[in-house]
Amino acid sequence: ISCSLVGSEMCIRDRSRHTVRKALGILEQDGYVEAFHGRGTYCSENVRHIKNSKNIAVVTTYISDYIFPRLIQGMDNVLSESGYSIILKNTANSRQKEARCLEELLKKDIDGLIIEPSKSEMICKHRNLYQNLDKFEIPYVFIQGIYSEMRDKPHILMDDAQGGYLVTRYLLELGHKKIKGFFKADDMQGLERHKGYVKALQESGIAYDPDDVVWFHTEDRKVKPALMAKEMVQSGQLPDGIVCYNDQIAVQVMEELEKMGVRIPDDI
């Protein structure tokens, strides 16, 4: 049985027309084939998704940067122990690339999908592809973020708001009052960490000032934080401390401040 199941039902040797029709009826009922009037009988799309491949697709925003090598290695270790293989893809935090990855994976035989959504704070415009995963009963789980309209789907998240709160609280407990924040605007993690930052300030009786927050996006993440740190020094308005979205941004900001002669942690 390949693309066209049978050109003529009698082409199956030594089987009656009745037997062939009955067999095709059972296959169609079970979803293995589709019959088209006047065209023939074909393998169903469902055949590609029987889920016995022992392949798990893993889609992350990046592969070689930051925390991702260890993250992927951890998943591979666990899956390998259970006899599964990884199909690895990355999106570079691009919605278009995420959609292409899903389209490609829907053409493959996979048993499940682990995916980090791209720009998770924005509306998902390719939700139909996730609906196809549901249609073919391919299980999937979101990691590190989730689209707001898909919160009913399985997901594993850090408590980003609590993380932002604890970091800000730490600086406040050291006696710092003027605390700037550098946060990512197009990922859910950035907004949640910002919420924690605001909560800590408010609990300490410090009014939240939007001007104390630098927002950046995926496209300018390697430029804007350093640029804004430089402008901050040039303005002569140094804060007591800075809360950064993650370690990468913290290092970028620190390096720029040190270039400008700012001592860390003495001055900031």
Task: Give the residues covered by each predicted segment.
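Short, ordered loop/turn segments at secondary-structure junctions
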Residues: 38, 91, 118, 145-146, ...
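Minor-groove-contacting beta-hairpin "wing" of winged helix-turn-helix DNA-binding domains
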Residues: 34, 39-46
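Single conserved hydrophobic/aromatic residue that forms the stacking wall/gate
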Residues: 1-7, 11-12
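Short coil turns linking two alpha-helices in DNA-binding domains
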Residues: 15-16
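Bacterial carbohydrate/catabolite-sensing allosteric modules
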Residues: 30, 77-85, 100, 104-111, ...
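Amphipathic helical "hinge" segments at domain boundaries
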Residues: 48-112, 119, 198, 202
